[in-house]
Design a protein with these regions (language model features):
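Basic, helix-initiating cap at the start of DNA-binding domains
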Residues: 1-24, 28-40, 53-57
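Short, charged helix-capping/linker segments at alpha-helix termini
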Residues: 27-28, 142-146
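Hydrophobic alpha-helical connector segments
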Residues: 58, 69-101, 148, 152
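Short, basic, alpha-helical segments at the C-terminal edge of helix-turn-helix-like DNA-binding modules
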Residues: 61-67
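C-terminal peripheral helix-coil segments that are non-catalytic and often amphipathic
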Residues: 82, 94, 123-127, 131-138, ...
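Short secondary-structure transition hinges
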Residues: 89-141, 164
């Protein structure tokens, strides 16, 4: 089999299994069903992945890489608070659109069911959020008393909770929930006149892209004189 065909087959296996994991979870997926769905033999499946856990590790690794890319602090450092808000929306958008990310998020929560040792993909995300919060504090966009580690923990826990709850709700509501979260969180995070002469407010902008609706919270600055 040519290398390109082998790559395509491997990707088909990953994508089909990710869709199944995202819908039914680790315990609810039988690889025999995936093999049948794809029209492959068991031998073909195990040529690429020796076990179910190998597939899990592949999916979680891809999800972790996606989280790191979407929330990478250096790329967002020009305006760290805005970058933090926009990157959280990007994570939610990716979760809604990308079956591998949806499966990765679910499997991260079910790691205790997996015999292989799998790192928590949310840890890199958490570190990136902390870095953006530190940068926002240096830029006096948030209060000097903010504990970056605790706020990063809170943000990640809230977003992960939204992802888990989405299994019982329509996915479109996740963006609305995220906007509500930031509306409440920024009240406690942002600097007040006593901290800096600049007042900052946040507004939500809504843009449409085809049939999908993308919401991004954009930080705007108003300078009081």
């Amino acid at each position: 089999m040519p290398q390109s065909e082998r790559h395509d087959t491997r990707e088909r296996i990953v994508e089909a299994t990710a869709a199944a994991f995202g819908a039914r979870g680790y315990a609810g997926v039988n690889l025999n069903e995936v093999v049948k769905q794809l029209g492959l033999t068991k031998g073909a499946m195990y040529f690429y992945f020796a076990s179910k856990d190998d597939l899990v590790c592949e999916i979680i690794a891809r999800y972790a890489a996606s989280l790191d890319d979407l929330t990478e602090p250096k790329r967002l450092s020009a305006n760290p608070l805005e970058g933090l808000i926009k990157s959280s929306q990007s994570v939610i958008d990716d979760f809604l659109r990308n079956p591998i990310s949806r499966a990765g998020a679910r499997l991260a929560h079910e790691r205790n069911l997996i015999s292989a040792s799998v790192a928590d993909p949310n840890e890199t995300w958490r570190r990136n959020v902390e870095a953006l919060l530190r940068a926002a504090k240096r830029a006096k966009q948030i209060k000097s008393t903010v504990d970056e580690q605790r706020i990063a923990d809170l943000l990640i826990d809230c977003l992960v909770g939204m992802q888990r709850a989405s299994n019982d709700r329509k996915g479109a509501s996740l963006s609305d929930q995220l906007q509500l979260f930031w509306k409440m969180a920024l009240t406690g995070l942002q600097t007040q006149p006593a901290d800096t002469p600049k007042k900052r407010s946040v507004k939500a902008s809504v843009t449409r892209n085809g049939d999908s609706q993308h919401r991004a919270a954009i930080v705007t600055k108003k300078v009081s004189r």
